[in-house]
């Protein structure tokens, strides 16, 4: 659980200039959807038009399709699409479930499948792949990228299991 715990902390403490204290994941996702909606409106499609939501969804899906070729990109893209639909439908419960998945809080695949229809969860084995997907997504969402700062990295050396300690050390070096 050390790698997944690291991932959870990184996502929980995600910050942007307008929300420097952390917890910015929802804001980033909502800002992305709002920016796509604004771009569609500036393209001449009225927000009152029946074509508006369709055009927004097409733009969102074009970003999502680009992610499907990345490792775990298909599931990540599916969850972004679910978040978008929950956003437009005002379904706060579904948004919360998608955010729970993005934060790595699902502990079983069964629970994720029942609540979201996805058969994959973020684990110790693949958390770094999801961090890379977030970095890619942030670029698509209009940010310059994702910068990761580790404070008190010495805590890795305090992990009692040598294999876990080495694995986490190697992941951080890879970053």
Language-model segments: residues:
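P-loop NTPase nucleotide-binding core
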Residues: 1-141
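Generic alpha-helix signal with a bias toward terminal, lower-confidence helices
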Residues: 41-44, 150, 162-165
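Substrate-gripping "pore-loop 1 plus following alpha2 helix"
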Residues: 127-131, 163-175
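Conserved P-loop NTPase "ATPase switch" module shared by AAA+ and STAND
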Residues: 142-162
């Amino acid at each position: 659980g050390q790698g997944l715990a690291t991932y959870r902390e990184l996502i929980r403490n995600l910050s942007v200039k307008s929300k420097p204290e952390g917890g910015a994941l929802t804001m980033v996702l909502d800002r992305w959807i709002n920016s796509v909606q604004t771009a569609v409106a500036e393209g001449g499609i009225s927000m009152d038009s029946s074509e508006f939501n369709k055009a927004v969804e097409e733009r969102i899906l074009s970003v999502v399709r680009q992610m499907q070729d990345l490792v775990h990109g298909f599931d990540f893209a599916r969850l972004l699409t679910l978040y978008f639909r929950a956003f437009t439908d005002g379904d706060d419960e579904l948004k919360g479930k998608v955010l729970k998945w993005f934060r790595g809080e699902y502990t079983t695949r069964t629970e994720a499948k029942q609540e979201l229809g996805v058969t994959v969860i973020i684990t110790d084995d693949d958390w770094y792949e999801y961090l890379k997907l977030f970095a890619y997504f942030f670029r698509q969402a209009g940010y310059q990228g994702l910068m990761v700062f580790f404070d008190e990295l010495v805590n890795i050396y305090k992990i009692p299991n040598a294999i876990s300690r080495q694995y986490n050390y190697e992941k951080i070096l890879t970053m």
